[in-house]
């Protein structure tokens, strides 16, 4: 697993948590 991909997924999850 690439760190960049993991970081991107973590950022997406964070944005979803902020929206909801």
Swiss-Prot record:
Which GO MF terms does the UniProt record name?
A: metal ion binding; oxidoreductase activity, acting on paired donors, with incorporation or reduction of molecular oxygen, reduced flavin or flavoprotein as one donor, and incorporation of one atom of oxygen
Keyword Endoplasmic reticulum part of the UniProt annotation: yes
Q: Does the keyword Endoplasmic reticulum apply?
A: yes
Keywords, sorted A to Z: Endoplasmic reticulum, Heme, Iron, Membrane, Metal-binding, Microsome, Monooxygenase, Oxidoreductase
Location in the cell = Endoplasmic reticulum membrane; Microsome membrane
User: Which top-level group of life is the source organism from?
Assistant: Eukaryota
Q: Which reaction does it catalyse?
A: an organic molecule + reduced [NADPH--hemoprotein reductase] + O2 = an alcohol + oxidized [NADPH--hemoprotein reductase] + H2O + H(+)
- Principal localization? endoplasmic reticulum
Q: Of which family is this protein a member?
A: Belongs to the cytochrome P450 family.
Q: What is this protein called?
A: Cytochrome P450IIB
Q: What is the lineage of its organism?
A: Eukaryota, Metazoa, Chordata, Craniata, Vertebrata
């Amino acid at each position: 697993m690439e760190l960049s991909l993991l970081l991107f997924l973590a950022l997406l999850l964070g944005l979803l948590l902020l929206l909801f």
